[in-house]
Structures are given as structure tokens and as C-alpha cells.
Amino acid sequence: MQMTDIARMAGVSASTVSRALSGSPLIPEATRTRITELARSLNYRVNAGAASLRKGDVQTIGVVLLSDSAQMISDPFLLGILGSLTDAVNEQGMNLLLSRLHEDSKDRMRSMVESGQVTGLIVIGQLTLHEHLNELAHLGIPMAVWGAALPDASYPVVGSDNRLGGYLATRHLIEQGCRRIAFFGDTTHPEAGQRFQGHAQAMEEAGIELDPRLRQHFLFGDARLRESIDGWLNQQLDFDAIFACSDVTAISLMGALRERNIAVPSQVRVVGYDDILLASHVHPPLTTVRQPIAQAGRALVDLMFESVAGAPRRNIVLPTELIVRESSL
């Protein structure tokens, strides 16, 4: 249940509902009472953070990193997103409260908003919490999420076209003559799952059968990444290319290949994802799918404020571009 739903039932605007539930004297008492009783009958919870924002009290946006236990907050892509968000929040004259939550502490997201600690939430990543995020949206918790746009999502999402990115990366490798293409990414996560869909589509179009031995489940920013890579390479499987779902994984792979005297790109071509700053400075420079991090922060803040105002939910899909460098040529 969202503020726009109550507005539709009451025959008023979302801003009128917002003012009525915050006790604004600008709304006639009879109207305030009618809207308040309707909201109570529907078990709609007033967002203390949003009410405080309207009164000018709360000047803080909560930024939540949904992290696996092994994921490092120092991951370059996460740091890039945080930097972009900080700039966008500062432009609004507000502050940022950063929290790192695991699946077992997910209920803190709701309490952060309902207690008035923050105005709304910007959530980085979805992990396997898609249904929980939907529940929060139905409770009227204002938020915007960085991740994959899913068909049944009730919350606004900002992200790149992950399926297209996976398709472009794999098609490029196929065009270079590759046929035994390994995929590195944890497909239980929505973003990596969509990238694998694009990878599989490109392989199918080229008439290349997927080899399950070349599909490796690696978490974004896993601290045990190098250990896992070494274990996989020690199997001595036949492959001529690798598409990794993050640049950090791709760069780690290139280091492991170099230690085994396997040359990139003459023996194995490598493509990453994200286009972090380091991607163009490693040797050889890394071909990657660029996510426009600089645009992400502003888009997330815009959607979060729209959610606070009770505006209809929408998604923003940022441009997805393959950046070709030496690692795949």
C-alpha cells in the first residue's frame, strides 16, 4: 500500500494525503480525519522520515549496502557508486547515513525510516532480498534501489541493461573467434543472472553449446576470489575466453593466468564488467562493459525523492556500452 493508493481511494492528490497524515493545518480537519481513518483501516504506516522532511527536520538519506558476508566494502565499483551518491546528496544540501546490512539484519531498513532516523533509503544491490524489498515498498517505505529491473518489482530501480551488457560482451568474444567462453558470476544475484541470460543468448545465436563446467559462481568482491580462481584453473579445462561479471574478477583472472604463463589475449581473451578506473590501467588494458556510475547517484536520489512524494514508481535504465581494449583483441 502506497500513498498514491490512498490518494486514489480518497479522491485527493498524493500531496494532500501527505499533508493530512503529517497533521498539516493547511488541510481541513474533516479531510484530515477522513484520510487518517482510511489510512488506519488499510494498515498504512506513516513514514516519520517523510513527514519530518516536509517539516524540514530530517536532512539525512539512508544508504544501505546489501552485502554478502564475504563482500568487501572497499570494492572499487561500490566505492564509485558511493562517491556518486555523496555528490548527489550534497547537491540537495542533505547528509548521507551509510549502513552495511546482511540478509539476517534486513529488518533494520524499515526501522531506519519509520523511526525518523532517515527520510528514505537508497539500497545498493538486491542479493536474494527482492521479495523483502517488495514488502517494504508495499508498506510505503520510500526508497530507490541500484540493481536489476525485475518484472514484478514494486520498488523503483536504477541500473544498467544487464542482459544487453552480457550479450554485447559475449558477442564480441565470439566475433574474435572464441568458442569456449567461460562465465564468471553468481547468477543467484539478479544483476549477474541477467548478464548470464545475455551471455547465453549470444552463445545460442552463434550455435555454441553452453558447457556447465565453464559456468563459475563467484560473488561480487569475494575476499576469497583468488583462491577460488586458482582452484578452477587447476582443473585445466579447455577455454579460450572469459566473461567476468565484474572488473575485479576479470583483473584477478588475468593475474592468475599470467602466473601460469597463459597469455592474454593471444591465448585467452578476457572481458569484464563495470569499467572501474583501474580497468584502463592494467596490462593489458581490460575490455569491459561500462556502467555510468557518475549518472547513477543523481538518478537514485531523484527516484528516492519521488518515492517520498508518493509519485508513481518508475525505473531508470542507464546506457550500457562495451568498451573494447587490448585484453580481448
Task: Annotate each PLM feature.
Residues 226-329:
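Flexible loop/turn connectors
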Residues 13, 59, 119, 178-180, ...:
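Short acidic/polar active-site loop segments enriched in Thr and Asp
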Residues 64, 124, 146, 183-184, ...:
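Short hydrophobic segments within beta-strands
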Residues 180, 210-214, 264-269:
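Short acidic capping loops at alpha-helix termini that bridge into adjacent secondary structure
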